[in-house]
């Protein structure tokens, strides 16, 4: 078997990626989230496949088909709640994975980092179109509000919105194409994930110290396969606890009501994992400005490799930037909270302050702290 896995054309790829891969000996549990994201993607594709067997993408039957899955299909309720809460687990792992990349300076591996940003955007798009499929009140109005933002684009905006809708409002054509997008996008994510891994294995993994670890590498298997299995076990434990005991805790009560174009919900809001970006969107009074800020809130991650002037990789020995980093995380949590609040004082003002802080930290404060720390090293 040893010779086979090293010489067989297919097994050789697996061997170099997951078995004999030289890995830094000191990577911590924060490095587990890549494999957890892979596990989440597998869970989402499998549960989604079984849901697609019973779901109908028609405005008249979509809502009742979801109810049918929960009531009449064997373990349909479990598959549905694993899929819905699996999305939340996916985004928790995603945010931690990106946060770890920022903290330990993994963005210096720019190809891997940029593919990661594309993966994040694709996952967000997949989750958005998926949220529309149950055709509840929040599904319908969320789709209407978010797709309508494209009308802010000069000249082509209105045409673009009608083109995406497939008509003059969110209707049957919209639901059908959103189902098609939701089905195909996870496979595109899987393809991008392989490219992400390909670029990562070209350079090798980063490690908590930020130092070159070429002289201290160990094989991925069995050391990190066991470690990843523990992470996967804990992830499944949390996911099953969510799906079995608190299945609707992260959902919106409005989505238990079938979509009604004539009745607008009091507060239209997306799923919790989009709330930080939604808060940034709402904090700008101008429509086009809000849309640009929304897009920039994710694309600004691409600025990290460009704005990096530090002589050290990672924040482990940089207390000034560490402090700013944790303020940034706290600010993100504030934005998430504000995104779920009504548009009224004092929430609008807090949202505006938090939005300005979000961009200021990335573009101004972190580069300044890098320079300060570089000068301290010279002393």
Curated annotation (Swiss-Prot):
In its keyword annotation, does this UniProt entry include Coiled coil? no
Which InterPro entries does the record cross-reference, listed alphabetically? Cyt_b/b6_C, Cyt_b/b6_C_sf, Cyt_b/b6_N, Cytb/b6-like_sf, Cytochrome_b, Cytochrome_b_C_euk/bac, Cytochrome_b_N_euk/bac, Di-haem_cyt_TM
Describe the task this protein carries out: Component of the ubiquinol-cytochrome c reductase complex (complex III or cytochrome b-c1 complex) that is part of the mitochondrial respiratory chain. The b-c1 complex mediates electron transfer from ubiquinol to cytochrome c. Contributes to the generation of a proton gradient across the mitochondrial membrane that is then used for ATP synthesis.
Further details from the record: Heme 1 (or BL or b562) is low-potential and absorbs at about 562 nm, and heme 2 (or BH or b566) is high-potential and absorbs at about 566 nm.
Under the GO molecular function aspect, what terms does this record hold? metal ion binding; ubiquinol-cytochrome-c reductase activity
Native organism:
Akodon philipmyersi (Myers' grass mouse)
Protein name (record): Cytochrome b
Assembly: The cytochrome bc1 complex contains 11 subunits: 3 respiratory subunits (MT-CYB, CYC1 and UQCRFS1), 2 core proteins (UQCRC1 and UQCRC2) and 6 low-molecular weight proteins (UQCRH/QCR6, UQCRB/QCR7, UQCRQ/QCR8, UQCR10/QCR9, UQCR11/QCR10 and a cleavage product of UQCRFS1). This cytochrome bc1 complex then forms a dimer.
What cystine linkages occur within this chain? none
Which cofactor names does the annotation list?
A: heme b
Question: Where is heme b b562 bound in this sequence?
Answer: 83, 182
**Record's cofactor remark:** Binds 2 heme b groups non-covalently.
* List of residues binding heme b b566: 97, 196
What keywords would UniProt list here? Answer: Electron transport, Heme, Iron, Membrane, Metal-binding, Mitochondrion, Mitochondrion inner membrane, Respiratory chain, Transmembrane, Transmembrane helix, Transport, Ubiquinone
Instruction: Name its cellular compartments.
Output: Mitochondrion inner membrane
Family label: Belongs to the cytochrome b family.
GO annotations under biological process? mitochondrial electron transport, ubiquinol to cytochrome c
Q: Where are the transmembrane segments?
A: 33-53, 77-98, 113-133, 178-198, 226-246, 288-308, 320-340, 347-367
Query: Corresponding gene?
Result: MT-CYB
Binding-site residues for a ubiquinone, renumbered to this chain:
201
Is this entry keyworded Electron transport?
yes
């Amino acid at each position: 078997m040893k010779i086979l896995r090293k010489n067989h054309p297919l097994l050789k790829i697996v061997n170099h990626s997951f078995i004999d891969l030289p890995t830094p000996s000191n990577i911590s549990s924060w490095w587990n989230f890549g494999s957890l994201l892979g596990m989440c993607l597998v869970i989402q594709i499998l549960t989604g496949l079984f849901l697609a067997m019973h779901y109908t993408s028609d405005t008249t039957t979509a809502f009742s088909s979801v109810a049918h899955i929960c009531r009449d299909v064997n373990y349909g309720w479990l598959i549905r709640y694993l899929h819905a809460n699996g999305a939340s687990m996916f985004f928790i792992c995603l945010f931690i994975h990106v946060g770890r990349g920022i903290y330990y300076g993994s963005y210096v591996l720019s190809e891997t980092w940029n593919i990661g940003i594309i993966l994040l955007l694709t996952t967000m798009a997949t989750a958005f179109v998926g949220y529309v499929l149950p055709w509840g009140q929040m599904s319908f109005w969320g789709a209407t509000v978010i797709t309508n933002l494209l009308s802010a684009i000069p000249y082509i905006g209105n045409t673009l919105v009608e083109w995406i809708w497939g008509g003059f409002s969110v209707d049957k054509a919209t639901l059908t194409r959103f189902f098609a997008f939701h089905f195909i996008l996870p496979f595109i994510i899987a393809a991008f994930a392989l490219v992400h891994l390909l670029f990562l294995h070209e350079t090798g993994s980063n490690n908590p110290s930020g130092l070159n670890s070429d002289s201290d590498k160990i094989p991925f298997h069995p050391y990190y396969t066991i470690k990843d299995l523990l992470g996967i076990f804990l992830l499944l434990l949390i996911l099953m606890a969510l799906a079995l005991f608190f299945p609707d805790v992260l959902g919106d009560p409005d989505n238990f009501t079938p979509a009604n174009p004539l009745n607008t919900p009091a507060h239209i809001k997306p799923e919790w994992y989009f709330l930080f970006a939604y808060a940034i969107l709402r904090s700008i009074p101008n429509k086009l400005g809000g849309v640009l800020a929304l897009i920039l809130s994710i694309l600004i991650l691409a600025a990290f490799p460009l704005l990096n002037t530090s002589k050290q990789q990672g924040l482990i020995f940089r207390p000034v930037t560490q402090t700013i980093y944790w303020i940034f995380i706290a600010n993100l949590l504030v934005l998430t909270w504000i995104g779920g609040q009504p548009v009224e004082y004092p929430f609008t003002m807090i949202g505006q302050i938090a939005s300005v802080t979000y961009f200021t930290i990335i573009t101004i404060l972190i580069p300044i702290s890098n320079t300060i720390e570089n000068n301290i090293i010279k002393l």
